[in-house]
């Protein structure tokens, strides 16, 4: 038998290593967008918050069915989708789409693909109520002091992503002692794009002592559009404040809606929140309530109507 040990031949190329997990297109977009936003951030406190949030997301990773908290919510289709920041769309078509979701008798502010749209919004607010957004330098310090103080990101990966990637903050302030009769309607509308769009709406509601207000959030989008909306809302109710909060989720049936709601109540305050989930293809609501003051209370109600392939999952924690 011939001895082949001495025969010199070029080594065979090693077979390619199998990836540990399928490529995650969404995470690639998240990472690139985080780098862009971090580089453009002008607020030192928000820059630190974004960096901390991204660190928490990287530590937790993209959720899978193997994790106890996610065993009923398969978000793999989200991970396989390549998202982009949405581009501008036709104004007439946009206005018609938004009009279908307006609520009569409310003061409406409209956000399109996560960005405030002054042309579609009310120009005057009731006395005792102010709303600013993150690009407005005025009042930014007050917003920064509260932003991220309620919404936990250490065990909630999409809350972490949303904190790292939000573009504009709807900062709602109810003045101490103010009783605002007209409901404020924040309408977040997502548009159809050639490449699925992604937006990360952020809302911060601060109700001063002995104040009272009703806040309505609506999430909707173009019919049959594929997109990701990943909102986080924080409600801070000071002593004896009363906040009635409503959320209507009426996204496209092809959309992904992964949301977080966190609230904190001070002494004698009351927050009631009512969530109605009617749209979306894959929907997840994470709710955190922290009763931080003696005699405070929170009412957490929810209703969802799904059929066919729709998935809606709600997780709640009360401390």
Provide a role label for each language-model segment:
Residues 1-201, 208-212, 218-219:
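N-terminal leader/transition segments
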Residues 3-7, 11, 52, 138-319:
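Conserved beta-strand/loop scaffold segments within soluble protein domains that form the structured core
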């Amino acid at each position: 038998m011939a001895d082949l040990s001495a025969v010199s031949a070029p080594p065979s190329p090693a077979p390619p290593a199998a990836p540990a997990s399928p490529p995650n297109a969404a995470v690639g977009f998240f990472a690139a967008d985080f780098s862009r936003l971090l580089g453009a951030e002008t607020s030192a406190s928000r820059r630190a918050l974004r960096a901390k949030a991204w660190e928490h997301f990287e530590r937790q990773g993209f959720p899978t069915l193997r994790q106890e908290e996610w065993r009923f919510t398969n978000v793999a289709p989200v991970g396989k989708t390549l998202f982009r920041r949405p581009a501008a769309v036709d104004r007439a078509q946009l206005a018609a789409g938004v009009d279908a979701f307006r609520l009569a008798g409310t003061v409406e502010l409209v956000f399109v693909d996560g960005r405030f749209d002054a042309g579609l919004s009310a120009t005057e607010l009731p006395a005792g109520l102010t709303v600013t957004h993150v690009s407005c330098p005025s009042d930014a310090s007050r917003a920064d002091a509260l932003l991220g103080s309620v919404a936990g990101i250490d065990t909630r990966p999409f809350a972490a992503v949303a904190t790292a990637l939000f573009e504009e903050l709807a900062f709602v302030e109810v003045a101490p002692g103010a009783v605002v009769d007209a409901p404020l309607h924040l309408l977040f509308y997502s548009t159809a794009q050639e490449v699925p769009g992604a937006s990360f709406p952020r809302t911060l509601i601060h109700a001063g002592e002995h104040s009272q207000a009703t806040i309505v959030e609506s999430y909707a989008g173009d019919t049959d559009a594929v997109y990701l909306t990943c909102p986080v809302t924080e409600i801070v109710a000071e002593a004896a404040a009363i906040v009635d909060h409503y959320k209507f989720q009426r996204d496209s049936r092809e959309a992904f809606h992964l949301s977080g709601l966190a609230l904190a109540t001070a002494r004698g305050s009351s927050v009631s929140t009512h969530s109605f989930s009617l749209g979306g293809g894959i929907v997840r609501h994470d709710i955190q309530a922290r009763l931080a003051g003696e005699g405070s209370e929170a009412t957490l109600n929810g209703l969802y109507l799904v059929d066919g392939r729709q998935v809606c999952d709600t997780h709640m924690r009360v401390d």
